Amino acid sequence: MMSKLGALLIICLLLFPLTAVPLDGDQHADRPAERLQDDISSKHHPMFDAVRGCCHPSTCHMRKGCSRCCS
């Protein structure tokens, strides 16, 4: 019984390999250059104080990448 299941699995994988499944066009893995252009780093973010390394007090609770709010 197990040999029949193994043979069936091999036949299915040969007829329909997993690499033949097309990736979705919206996935970022297909377009790494666009992913890098869309990245907004913290030093370009208007609510981030690059000198002190902290966020504007009104947005401190919204951002996880900044340290405690500057006072």
UniProtKB/Swiss-Prot annotation:
Name the keywords, alphabetized: Disulfide bond, Neurotoxin, Secreted, Signal, Toxin
The terms under GO molecular function for this entry are: ion channel inhibitor activity; toxin activity
Q: List the disulfide bonds.
A: C54-C70, C55-C66, C60-C69
Give the domain of life: Eukaryota
Q: From the Swiss-Prot or TrEMBL record, state where the protein is found.
A: Secreted
Q: State where it is primarily located.
A: secreted
InterPro entries, per database record: Conotoxin (IPR004214)
Secretion signal, residue range per the UniProt entry: 1-20
Classification via Pfam families: Conotoxin
Q: Which residues form the propeptide?
A: 21-52
User: What tissues express this gene product?
Assistant: Expressed by the venom duct.
- GO CC field: extracellular region
Q: Could you say which protein family the record assigns here?
A: Belongs to the conotoxin M superfamily.
Instruction: Please state what the annotation says regarding this protein's domains.
Output: The cysteine framework is III (CC-C-C-CC). Classified in the M-2 branch, since 2 residues stand between the fourth and the fifth cysteine residues.
Protein name as annotated: Conotoxin TxMMSK-05
Q: Which organism is it from?
A: Conus textile (Cloth-of-gold cone)
